[in-house]
Curated annotation (Swiss-Prot):
It holds the Pfam family p450. The keyword Transmembrane helix applies. Disruption phenotype: Impairs the hydroxylation of the flavonoid skeleton at position C2'. InterPro entries: Cyt_P450 (IPR001128), Cyt_P450_CS (IPR017972), Cyt_P450_E_grp-IV (IPR002403), Cyt_P450_sf (IPR036396), Cytochrome_P450_monoxygenase (IPR050121). This is Cytochrome P450 monooxygenase cfoH. Disulfide bonds: none annotated. Belongs to the cytochrome P450 family.
Length: 538
């Protein structure tokens, strides 16, 4: 090597040395190595490293966060199960399962399987503490304590006293639809049913909670911004919920809250009604108890559990969980049934043949229409109230899957209702199709065979969850939906404004459907208003 070459080599080595000792470059090199180690060590040491799924999903929760933010998690989950089978690794420590037979084990009634942290971010920060509600409390023992004081009010008997409240709002809903969307000569201007389903659900839950409508039906638009606020809160919960540690720096930030928009207007309204109820200033009818009456009763009977913050948490969960699930279900029922004229005409005929004795239709009479129940259950099968996975941590002892493989303690597993409800082993080869008849006994089907099939479908139904964490409001929501669908069809003729138009669905905490434009016409012989006290707006 001549002198020139030696000089070049020495120069290159000196340049490398200078780069290596440069503090900024050294910092970034160390940072890069640290990041690689941060992701790669858990990846190679994970007890579920052999499970199949997207590579990025096995490295970071941000993969799920990305799809959650885009509103397509249900479609992504379904596609991945079609590719990888019944077990898919969708996060570093999470397995998504398409095993309906494991629902009763993992979503148990004994509280052994603990909820994962993403459920907990809906807790509310009060001072230096976080108040968890009946949904967000992950500890099974604490959840049972919160649930016990109010459980009886949500039994089928308990919610029956709320039927007059639903009747009042339903009668007003019918009046508003008739005033704005019908004409004497026939069908009126298009009704944006996706929006009005939300308005109706908001007014119904407000009326049932504190005996006053929220005002959305009256104003015919999102006058206080709460429909939009609720949507953005739900977007935050499912997006940040995929990486729960972020919530400590956002919504639970001790210095400056950067979290989602709050339910302050609803909380203020609830507090005002609570104050007036206690002082005797409000004029609600005690013979028609509402949920606020129930919660005050629980406060008297369980003072060690139900203080004022806890009572407020019950009210806010009423609103957060009781509005969107109902609106989602109503949209799905009308859209799916109207898209299939055979189904719609059969449903319409059975409702009109029922000869209801009064309007709004009573819950007991609505439940007596077999095809109505079939349409409602089929709509909720395809579009359950939540299309995000219901997750639990595997308890001590682990979990053996039907294929014989083992999932160790501490790994999170879950079931996405959108996926489970399309499992062909349960619902048949046409599981992706809307066919209400699957809930009815076939002409050539034996009673025993139908009972077995129905039992399997019921045990696989996650429309309201399962086990000890099953939606507490299932009986109220069911009553509301049955009465509403039966009454609306008994009063109006419906048609799609544009039969060729497809709806759009954004999957947040609850599916948000849009683009459901309908035309309605009042049926001959029906008088509107329906002759009820139409209630009051707060």
């Amino acid at each position: 090597m001549d002198t020139t070459e030696l000089t070049q080599v020495e120069g290159s080595m000196m340049a490398v040395t200078r780069l290596a000792t440069h503090p900024v470059l050294t910092f970034f090199a160390i940072l890069l190595v640290a990041i690689l180690l941060w992701y790669m060590i858990p990846y190679f040491t994970s007890p579920i490293r052999s499970r199949r799924g997207p590579l990025l999903a096995s490295l970071t929760n941000y993969w799920r966060m990305y799809h959650a933010a885009g509103g397509s998690m249900h479609l992504v989950s379904y596609a991945l199960h079609a590719r990888y089978g019944p077990v898919v690794r969708m996060a570093p420590n999470y397995l998504d399962l398409d095993y309906p037979s494991l629902i009763s084990t993992c979503l148990d009634s004994h509280g052994v399987w603990k909820k994962t942290e993403w459920h907990g971010i809906s807790g509310v920060k009060l001072g230096n503490k976080v108040l968890y509600n009946i949904f967000s409390e992950c500890n099974p023992a604490e959840h049972a304590q919160i649930k016990k004081p109010v459980a009886k009010y949500f039994s089928s008997t308990g919610v029956s006293v709320m039927e007059p409240h639903i009747n009042n709002v339903l009668a007003f809903f019918v009046k508003q639809l008739d005033d704005q969307f019908t004409e004497l000569a026939g069908f009126g201007k298009p009704l944006k049913f996706d929006e009005w389903a939300s308005f109706y659900a908001w007014d119904t839950i407000a009326q049932s909670t504190w005996s006053r409508r929220a005002g959305h039906l009256e104003h015919a638009f999102d006058f206080d911004g709460m429909v939009d606020t609720s949507a953005r809160v739900m977007d935050y919960l499912v997006t940040v919920g995929m990486q729960p540690s972020l919530d400590r720096f956002l919504d639970k930030n001790p210095i400056f809250r950067i979290g989602p928009p709050s339910f302050v207007p609803v909380a203020n309204a609830a507090f005002n009604h609570l104050t007036k109820r206690r002082s005797g200033e409000d004029d609600h009818d005690p013979s028609k108890p509402d949920f606020l009456d129930c919660y005050l009763d629980a406060m008297k009977k369980y003072p060690e559990v139900v203080d004022e913050p806890r009572l407020m948490s019950y009210i806010l969960v009423n609103v957060a969980a009781g509005v969107d699930t109902t609106a989602t279900t109503l949209r799905a029922i009308f859209y799916l049934a109207l898209k299939d004229r055979r189904v719609w005409e059969k449903l319409e005929a059975q409702i009109l043949d029922a000869s209801f004795t009064k309007l709004p239709v009573s819950y007991s009479q609505a439940r007596a229409v077999p095809y109505l129940e079939a349409v409602i259950r089929e709509s909720m099968r395809l579009w359950p109230g939540s299309c995000f996975a219901q997750e639990r941590y595997v308890p001590p002892g682990g979990l053996t899957l039907p294929d014989g493989s083992f999932v160790p303690e501490g790994v999170a597993v879950g079931f996405n209702a959108y996926v489970i409800h399309r499992n062909k082993n349960v619902w048949g080869d046409d599981a992706e199709e809307f066919r209400p008849e699957r809930w009815l006994q076939g002409e050539d089907e034996s009673t025993e065979r139908f009972k077995d099939r129905l039992r399997l479908m019921n045990s696989s139904d996650l429309s309201f969850g399962a086990g000890s964490r099953k939606c507490l409001g299932v009986n109220f929501a069911t009553m509301e939906v049955y009465k509403t669908v039966a009454t609306l069809i008994a009063v109006f003729e419906f048609e799609l404004a544009d039969p060729a138009r497809e709806w759009k669905v954004h999957n947040s905490m609850f599916p948000r459907q849009s683009g459901i434009d309908l035309r309605i016409k009042r049926r001959e012989g029906v008088t509107v208003p329906l002759g009820l006290d139409l209630g009051k707006e707060f």
